[in-house]
């Protein structure tokens, strides 16, 4: 409707009186097109303006808003979705869905502000042992410092259009200012140094040394900053010959001592090398700075026939949720905290998760359990279905019949059991395809966009 533009212009007129800035950010993101396809007036507008599809309708809309604001002496900024259907002539693009939108805009000689979710969304977790509820993701300070806002795909002239980068922090999970501070500091210092320093002057080693001094300044300012960088960190690694897993502990602090304790042994031992784990157990790690206990971590391992075995992914997970690669799905650690500990998930945007697991030898298999997550408000939907094939030689795979039992427990933990109908089934190799939900339908959170598929662990029993 033409009246829609009149309403927007009235609103923008008031915005302009409040904000005398050169730039006005108009958004333009996450707009599903389904309703436009059903709207007779939208379809008529497309015919009148000779627009071939709804993407061009969005571009028409953005360009009209831009023309109005340009006439007021202002310039627009929009999220990278404004590229769809054709970019408005004078628009500046904020590239948040990765860097590709920024690359495309710069190649069209448009100014760009890089703000990809990975690594400059500061509402994401900054520790694998995050004790604070977050929206998900994992952007530790070292990843922030390593960020280079000018992509290598751009030549010298195109690179001039990269104005810089911006950190974003959405506040759905931040109810009070001290939590905002916790997520902001010290990552904002890392990004500031990245953006203010010549590339050749950056030194991660030197920055780490200066963190201690920075923390003293934060203390004086009474800022509730995060010390996650110095926390005791855990990682799970494959063992030699795929026999069990290894539990690794580390901290960035040069002084102090790391110790650990296995659940079947009350003795606390000094940590020297990764701990070999070959059965279901609970391990604890301790970091002592002198005699003071600074940090404690706990890891629970659920062993089954797939734990620690060789696994391959047909297609890698999204770079926003890569976990530790395919091994994440057989590391024996099941996420019981939900999206807040998203590093334990592999996330697939619109794609299926297809894996092949080598159990090492031919063995009985009675069921396969796929652990995942459903969080529709975050566009994470249950899988459409799961396919299972088995093989003794790794080359010739056969379908296998099974019953399915699905339940949601705890923090939206999706547990799907594939119960084999033939109780005498034996195999060495399993090929498991977890089908993505697909395009999110109208009326659902994220309608019109690709659904996320989150997979945590695959059990074979």
What are these regions (language model features)?
Residues 406-412:
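Short proline/glycine- and polar residue-rich coil/turn motifs
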Residues 76-91, 97-248:
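Flexible, acidic glycine-rich loops studded with aromatic residues
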Residues 338-401, 412-461:
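Aromatic, loop-rich ligand-recognition surfaces of beta-strand-rich domains
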Residues 22-25, 75-77, 90-92, 109-112, ...:
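Beta-sheet entry/capping signal
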Residues 1-89, 96-104:
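Active-site neighborhood of glycoside hydrolase catalytic domains
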Residues 188, 293-295, 442-448:
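Beta-sandwich strand segments
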Residues 198, 202, 208-354, 373:
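Short, compositionally stereotyped local motifs that mark structural "simplifiers"
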